[in-house]
Amino acid sequence: MYIEMVDETGQVSKEMLQQTQEILEFAAQKLGKEDKEMAVTFVTNERSHELNLEYRDTDRPTDVISLEYKPELEIAFDEEDLLENPELAEMMSEFDAYIGELFISIDKAHEQAEEYGHSFEREMGFLAVHGFLHINGYDHYTPEEEAEMFGLQEEILTAYGLTRQ
C-alpha cells in the first residue's frame, strides 16, 4: 500500500511515522487492500477545527477526519477500449487505487491518550485504523455498524500489538 504522509505540525517523530505506515499496511492486508493508495496528514487542533467545520459543519476540533475518495465522474469504458488504449487503462487503475485521506490531530491524540490512560502510540494507532476503516466504507451510525467496525478495529490493533495497556 502506498501512503503519502505529511506532518504539518513538525511534532511527529520518524518512529511514529513508521508505526503509522506499518499499522495502516497491516490493516490494508487484513482488508485485502494492499494495492490501494491513501494520504495521512498530521495536524494541530486549530487545523482540525477548520477542517471539521469545512467538511462536517462541526464547530470544534476532532481527533481524526476521514475523507473517503469517491470519483465524481462516472466514466464507462468497455474492455475493448481499455485493450486498445493501455494509457487509459493505467489512468483508470490509478483512480481506482486512491481510497482517501486522513487528518489526524496530534493535540487530540495526546489529550485522549492521557484521558483514556493508554500510550500515545496506542492512540495514534487507534486513530489511524479508525480513519482507515471509515475510508473503506465502515461506519458506526447504528449499533450493528458500530459492533462490526469497533470489533474489526480492536482485532487489527490487538493483532498488530497495540493493546489498551
Curated annotation (Swiss-Prot):
* Localization (cell): Cytoplasm
Enumerate the UniProt keywords alphabetically.
Cytoplasm, Endonuclease, Hydrolase, Metal-binding, Nuclease, Ribosome biogenesis, rRNA processing, Zinc
GO molecular-function terms, A-Z: metalloendopeptidase activity; RNA endonuclease activity; zinc ion binding
Q: What name is this protein filed under?
A: Endoribonuclease YbeY
Instruction: Note the superkingdom of the native organism.
Output: Bacteria
Could you tell me which species this protein originates from? Streptococcus pneumoniae serotype 2 (strain D39 / NCTC 7466)
Family the entry assigns: Belongs to the endoribonuclease YbeY family.
Q: Which cofactor does it need?
A: Zn(2+)
Question: What GO biological process term is on the record, naming one?
Answer: rRNA processing
Among InterPro entries, the record links this protein to:
MetalPrtase_cat_dom_sf_prd, YbeY, YbeY_CS
Give the matching SUPFAM superfamilies.
Answer: Metalloproteases ('zincins'), catalytic domain (SSF55486)
